A protein has these predicted regions:
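The start of beta-strands in P-loop NTPase/AAA+ ATPase cores
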Residues: 6, 36, 58-59, 82, ...
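Extreme N-terminus of proteins, especially the signal/transit-peptide cleavage junction
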Residues: 1-7
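Class I S-adenosyl-L-methionine
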Residues: 71-81, 91-281
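Alpha-helix termination/capping residues and helix-transition junctions
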Residues: 3, 31-33, 53, 78, ...
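Residue-level signal for beta-strand positions within conserved beta-sheet cores that form or flank
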Residues: 5, 32-35, 154, 173
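Non-cysteine beta-strand/loop elements that form the S-adenosyl-L-methionine
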Residues: 85-87
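SAM cofactor-binding core of SAM-dependent methyltransferases
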Residues: 7-66
Length: 282
């Protein structure tokens, strides 16, 4: 599957533009070409950041996707586009949450994607979510998602990817779902291994910052406000207490996943802590 034309792109659940940034890097490095024609995001501050980072003039501002998809006519008026991307809300599938899946309103956002897909029929779809989506509810949730896409006429492939395999030194597993209206060649492979091989082949001509370990990323001069106090340090670095046992480790070359509750300062078995000596090393 070789695509040489400019692809029209719409980004759903855009946040501050994760997919868009990737598309822009591919364009900058002359690997692929994209034109962004619209985006949806409900968080006001995320939208402010998105508009500050990108030139969104003449793009469709879809806003709240629930409200937007209430009108088939409104969906139909979207400009035609080739690629739909979206990291739909993951809290209802995450191992860190209650895992209510489709029983939570946020878990139903996938079906708002399908509302757009059934009207606009974009040739390509790329969706992202937490690894646990793949196994949630004994895989019934994931199977439903794949079946919905197939029922809309799409060929669907998927795999689980880890950021540390792509020169981003953090353990962060995500399931990526690729769907296309085009027939897939018999030799088409969509897997973490195949994509990693493609990345390795192209990375020398990619301008994105790359690092195999956190040493290449951590700032050398760290403000005092980020230092652990002597009072809290023994607790955070301890291997456990009466009701909680753990193996606390600092100076991880590959960072642990970031969590929404990390600001609460978990123990060193969960969060990422680094010594000044480690930061200063090469």
């Amino acid at each position: 599957m070789i695509i040489r034309r400019t692809l029209q792109h719409i980004e759903l659940f855009a946040g501050i533009g994760g997919f868009r940034t990737a598309m822009d890097i591919l364009g900058r490095d002359k690997i692929a070409r994209f034109k962004h024609v619209g985006y949806s995001e409900i968080d006001r501050k995320a939208v402010q950041t998105y508009c500050a980072n990108y030139d969104t003039e003449n793009e469709v501002v879809m806003g709240d996707i629930v409200h937007f998809t209430e009108s088939v006519e409104r969906i139909g008026k979207l400009p035609n586009f080739d690629l739909l991307t979206g990291g739909f809300p993951c809290q209802t599938f995450s191992m860190m949450g209650h895992q209510r899946g489709f029983d939570d309103e946020r878990g139903l956002m996938f079906f708002r994607i399908m509302d757009i897909v059934r009207v606009k029929h974009p040739p390509y779809i790329l969706l992202e979510n937490v690894k646990n989506l793949y196994t949630h509810d004994k895989r019934r949730t994931f199977t439903r998602i794949v079946e919905e896409l197939k029922a809309a006429g799409y060929n669907v492939v998927y795999d689980i990817f880890n950021t540390q395999d792509f020169c981003l030194p953090q353990t962060r597993n995500r399931v990526l779902i690729f769907a296309t209206l085009e027939p897939l060649p018999n030799n088409f492979i969509f897997s973490s291994k195949a994509v990693k091989e493609c990345f390795e082949f192209n990375k020398s001509r990619m301008s994105v910052r790359q690092s195999d370990t956190v040493i290449g990323i951590l700032e050398k001069n760290v403000p005092d406000k980020y230092m652990l106090s002597e009072r809290i340090k023994p607790t955070l670095l301890a291997d456990g207490s009466a009701g909680f046992k753990s193996k606390s480790e600092i100076n991880q070359l590959i960072a642990r996943p970031l969590t929404a509750s990390m600001h609460k300062m978990h123990r060193a078995c969960q969060d990422n802590y680094y010594s000044l000596d480690f930061i200063a090393s090469d």
